Amino acid sequence: MWKEKVLEYENQMIEDLKGLLSIESIRDDSKATADAPVGPGPREALDYMYNLGKRDGFSTHDVDHIAGRIEAGKGEDVLGILCHVDVVPAGDGWDSNPFQPVVTDNAIIARGTLDDKGPTIAAYYAVKILNEMKVDWKKRIHIIIGTDEESDWKCTDRYFKTEEMPALGFAPDAEFPAIHGEKGITTFDLVQNEVTEDTDEPDYELLKFESGQRYNMVPDYAKAEVLVKENMTDVIQNFENFLQQNQLQGESTVDSGILILTIEGKAVHGMDPSLGVNAGLFLLKFLASLNLNKSAKDFVEFNERYLFESHFGEKMGMKFHTDIMGDVTTNIGVISYDKEKAGRYGINLRYPEGFKFEDAIDRFRSEINELGFNLELGKVQKPHYVDKNDPFVKTLVNAYRNQTGDMTEPYTIGGGTYARNLDKGVAFGAMFADSEDLMHQKNEYITKKQLINATSIYLEAIYALCVED
């Protein structure tokens, strides 16, 4: 029944999704204003969703242009559907323009198709279809739309300062059948205190190093500028050997006596950096083989001591595992060095329940202080957990099982979704076991089958929660 109903809306749903995907809704603080707190792109995407809601007869409510909601239904309790319309940077290597959606016979290709514009449109259409069926609502629905999920969550922080907290809700921003637990998440910077003067003349000077754009992405590109005072040919040959030994792609060029080295890696979501290839850490690994200036030497040796090939906090002394939530993970997402300003590592740490986070951070801070580094801690989000046997979770999972026949149990993840804003919130789709997970990667896409099936599941789940209940 539900899938047949969704198929009636397929063409319109894809057109609405294409419109949302065409908006380059990347956070841009350089263009932030009071009317666009995280930049014009996210604001445009937020307005786009409001306009869809108004077109379809829903009321909308804006919260300082950084978040808002589309309202449906009636009743005392509220079901929250927590979506986001901001996206991570596209990165390099796409086969098409990431913000000019390509629709094939089977799929839609663009940045945000999986994370989280495709699922947002699927959930929206589930509510739209039920509303146009003129069902007898027993609950209100707030489709809550954020614009800063990929960075600092300023959107939901602001929203829930003044707006009603849903009694229960889900975020369509992960996998089916349901995610009932999420690791704690924080970001922190490891900042080199000061530039150290050299007592001896170094053979090589690291002038500049850049890698990564987001703490929650594995960097797929790194670039270093090195002043080479002798043996330029040997350094280039050693670099080529390093690339070959590590099965990496990269380039070396010389510009006015400056050697420019680049490495390409593989970008993946920072919740499991072991699945990617961190271009920045590999390039630092090579630079450690050179007799660099003192500050640069200290910086690259820090990588070797604490970061390189240590995805689970082993070298930081933070290794920890639970059967329910898994391992601590550490993603080194943003790396920079400047000869005049020294260096900085930006890290995304995710940890399960039971990990003594504050103790671990305090110990590590003391340890690296002795090496000339400070730890600057950012926002901390504690682990989130809802019992998988809760009736709400069971209702969602039953909708999934009815539509798919798959009896997979709910599970926990290292990712963080808006679901953790709610006491009783879970992540619910929109990826399936056979979906190719290209979140935060090039050539991100959603299949038409996935879009239709996810919308059908949301239809049944929302009907069970807000009409039958």
UniProtKB/Swiss-Prot annotation:
InterPro entries: Bact_exopeptidase_dim_dom, M20A_pepV-rel, Peptidase_M20, Peptidase_M20A. Zn(2+) 2 binds at residues 84, 115, 173. Disulfide bonds: none annotated. Its EC number is 3.4.13.-. Keywords: Dipeptidase, Hydrolase, Metal-binding, Metalloprotease, Protease, Zinc. GO terms for biological process: L-arginine biosynthetic process; proteolysis. Binds 2 Zn(2+) ions per subunit. Zn(2+) 1 binds at residues 115, 150, 440. The active site is at residues 86, 149. Its cofactor is Zn(2+). GO terms for molecular function: acetylornithine deacetylase activity; dipeptidase activity; metallopeptidase activity; zinc ion binding. NCBIfam families: dipeptidaselike, PRK07318.1. Belongs to the peptidase M20A family. This is Putative dipeptidase SERP1310.
